[in-house]
Design a protein with these regions (language model features):
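C-terminal edge and immediately downstream basic/flexible tail or linker adjoining helix-turn-helix-like DNA-binding
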Residues: 2-7, 15-16, 91, 160-161, ...
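A short, charge-rich alpha-helical start-of-domain segment used by transcription regulators
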Residues: 3-29, 39-42
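Amphipathic, Lys/Arg- and hydrophobic-enriched alpha-helical face
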Residues: 19-38, 53-55, 134, 186
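Hydrophobic-face residues of short alpha-helical interaction/recognition segments
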Residues: 27, 31, 56, 69, ...
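Structural recognition of an alpha-helix C-terminal capping motif at a helix-to-coil junction
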Residues: 43-50, 63-75
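Sigma70-family region 2
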Residues: 49-64, 83-85
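Arg/Lys-rich amphipathic alpha helix in sigma70-family domain 2
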Residues: 60, 74-93, 99-105, 123, ...
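A short pre-motif secondary-structure segment
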Residues: 144-148
Length: 194
């Protein structure tokens, strides 16, 4: 190997790690939410990182690396689970009223002085319980909700990551919110939160 080529490889590796390092924990958290397994999440992040490194030459410098990487991560997830895809059909957005959580928290007297009933429930649940509620969503809604609520991506970034129209993102997020309200309430009641 020529010394100049070796220097170039080291520079590319350093640049990749400078961009990838700060998002590693967030990517791992997303992978755990997508796969519902820490072991599978490890494999998914490793596969996505390898794919991203191999495709790093196609990354446009100055654009959003996090969104670019999350596109690779979600594509890797979908590729891995395409054959074994099994969605939980127990929650249907059509069955959940738009103000479900508002109604239930008011009925149970949990709302109190807080202006947001979701906050009233979330304050009484730890992160694991909120994660349980998020995990109960069907895959399409779970992915969009995770990217929006956990990873703080914008509608446009999520559309770019998932390679779908922004209207699809909005629709899935709207339905996902409704299903999440019901799931949060069910988790809260299972845990005897009051």
């Amino acid at each position: 190997m020529i010394a100049g080529e070796e220097t170039d490889i080291v520079a590319v590796q350093a640049e990749f790690m400078a961009l990838f390092g700060p998002i590693l924990q967030v990517a791992y958290g997303t992978a755990v939410r997508l796969t519902r397994s820490r072991t599978e999440a490890d494999d998914l992040v490793q596969d996505a990182a390898l794919l991203a490194y191999k495709a790093f030459g196609t990354f446009e410098r100055g654009t959003n690396f996090k969104a670019w990487f999350f596109r690779i991560l979600t594509n890797a997830f979908y590729s891995r689970h395409r054959k074994e895809k099994h969605e939980k059909a127990n929650l249907s957005s059509e069955e959940v009223p738009a103000l479900y959580l508002y109604q239930k928290t008011a009925e149970a007297g949990l709302w109190g002085s807080e202006s947001d009933p979701a906050a009233a429930i979330m304050d009484r649940l730890d992160a694991d319980r909120v994660g349980e509620a998020l995990d109960s969503l069907p895959e399409d809604y779970r992915v969009v909700s995770t990217l929006y609520f956990i990873d703080d991506l914008s509608y446009q970034q999520i559309a770019d990551v998932l390679q779908c129209p922004i209207g699809t993102v909005r629709s899935r997020l709207h339905r996902g919110r409704r299903m999440l309200q019901k799931a949060l309430w069910e988790v809260a009641m299972e845990r005897g939160i009051n």
